[in-house]
From Swiss-Prot:
Residues 24-49 form a propeptide. Keywords: Amidation, Ion channel impairing toxin, Neurotoxin, Secreted, Signal, Toxin, Voltage-gated sodium channel impairing toxin. It is found in: Secreted. It comes from Tetramorium bicarinatum (Tramp ant). This is U3-myrmicitoxin-Tb1a. Expressed by the venom gland. Residues 1-23 form the signal peptide. The modification Asparagine amide is found at residue 72. GO terms for molecular function: sodium channel regulator activity; toxin activity. One of its GO terms (cellular component) is extracellular region. It comes from the Eukaryota. The lineage of its organism: Eukaryota, Metazoa, Ecdysozoa, Arthropoda, Hexapoda.
Amino acid sequence: MKVLKFLFIAVIIVGLSGSLTWASPIANARAEADAEAAAEAVAKAVAEAVLPALPLLAGLMSLPFLQHKLTNG
C-alpha cells in the first residue's frame, strides 16, 4: 500500500511540475520557431552529407534486383 501511495504522489508531482514548466513566464516563447530552425539545419546538413554518396547508395540498393535477375533469368 505504501508503494501505491508513493507512486500516486510521484505521478501527481511529475504532472504538476511539467505543467508548471510550460506555464512558466521564463519559458521560451519562440520554442516552436527555434525547433523548426534546428530541424531545417539538420535536414540541410544530412542532405549535404548524403548527396555525394547517392550514386553509391543507388547502386547498392539495386544489387538484390540484379541478383534476382541473374539467378532467375
